[in-house]
């Protein structure tokens, strides 16, 4: 009887029933709303719950749960998907920590397609993409480029070694070190001392005479801002389309609100019998009160499971932005 009551309530959610129609619930789920759901999807969902109740009444149930949404964030990377299921992208540009050490730069591949769908021209799209992910070269970058580096002592071989590391770099500073360029080159061609090269926080670009502002400009040109906020041509009303689970890049301020994650889970919950495995990302400055209110909102939304993660709360995390 208890299981049949659960199934009847699931069926009511698929029909978007009124709260008073549910049995034995103090909180009621968010039903499937036909005006926001593809017709074939809600018809299939209703048919599935009709059938579940019909067969369960006749034969009983073997399993308490038969459908769930599995964790898909990391799997999606292996599948070459930007996102899977209801999980939003972590960031437009993110760095995945590798088990053997180091990081791998991952760029959302849907940005150009989305911009095309929104009606932007090819040249505008290229400008926006370059602003976000960079050009992966310093050849003609402002201030720090092949011409200015040659004047500092760089030759073709050194420029090639430096360029080879730019595609996966957090920032251009990571490619200017003795490991990437070679100790002998740094001493003989750049005039740097062993004491400088062995200093743990040595800033080679500063030692070569480049200012912080010049480094920042070259860095944005090469590695991008990692956000579309402030991009040329992009209309303000289109910014929410590119919102991610976290703030994107150094200058990004936008991110998907915590309750928006929960509302998305609540909208998907009526389609499945079990729980949804999904991380609800919170910014690093999230408070205990915000964590508390998020759990309460998830409970009121009849979400069967919820996991919160505050950015930077672990010593090591698989993705960073």
Task: Tell me the role of every PLM-derived stretch.
Residues 1-321:
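Long, C-terminal-biased catalytic regions of enzyme "large/alpha" subunits
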């Amino acid at each position: 009887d208890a299981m049949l009551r659960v199934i009847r309530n699931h069926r009511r959610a698929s029909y978007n029933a009124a709260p008073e129609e549910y049995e034995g619930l103090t909180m009621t789920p968010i039903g499937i709303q036909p005006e926001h759901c593809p017709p074939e999807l809600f018809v299939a969902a209703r048919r599935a719950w009709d059938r579940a109740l019909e067969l369960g009444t006749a034969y009983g149930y073997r399993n308490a749960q038969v459908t769930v949404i599995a964790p898909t964030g990391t799997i999606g990377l292996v599948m070459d998907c930007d996102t899977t299921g209801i999980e939003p992208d972590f960031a437009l540009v993110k760095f995945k920590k590798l088990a053997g050490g180091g990081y791998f730069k991952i760029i959302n591949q849907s940005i150009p397609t989305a911009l095309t769908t929104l009606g932007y021209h090819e040249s505008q799209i290229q400008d926006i993409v370059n602003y976000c992910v960079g050009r992966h070269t310093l050849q003609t970058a402002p201030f720090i480029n092949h011409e200015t580096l040659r004047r500092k002592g760089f030759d073709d071989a050194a420029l090639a070694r430096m360029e080879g590391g730019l595609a996966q770099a957090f920032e251009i500073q990571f490619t200017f070190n003795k490991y990437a360029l070679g100790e002998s080159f740094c001493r003989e061609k750049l005039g740097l001392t062993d004491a400088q090269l062995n200093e743990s926080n040595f800033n080679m670009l500063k030692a070569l005479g480049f200012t912080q502002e010049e480094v920042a400009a070259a860095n944005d040109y090469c590695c991008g801002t990692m956000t579309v906020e402030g991009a040329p041509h992009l209309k303000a009303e289109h910014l929410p389309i590119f919102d991610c689970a976290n703030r994107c890049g150094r200058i990004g301020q936008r991110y998907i609100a915590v309750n928006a994650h929960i509302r998305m889970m609540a909208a998907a919950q009526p389609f499945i019998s079990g729980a949804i495995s999904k991380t609800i990302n919170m910014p690093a400055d999230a408070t205990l009160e915000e964590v508390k209110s998020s759990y309460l909102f998830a409970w009121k939304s009849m979400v069967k499971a919820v996991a919160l993660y505050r950015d930077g709360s672990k010593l090591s995390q698989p993705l960073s932005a």
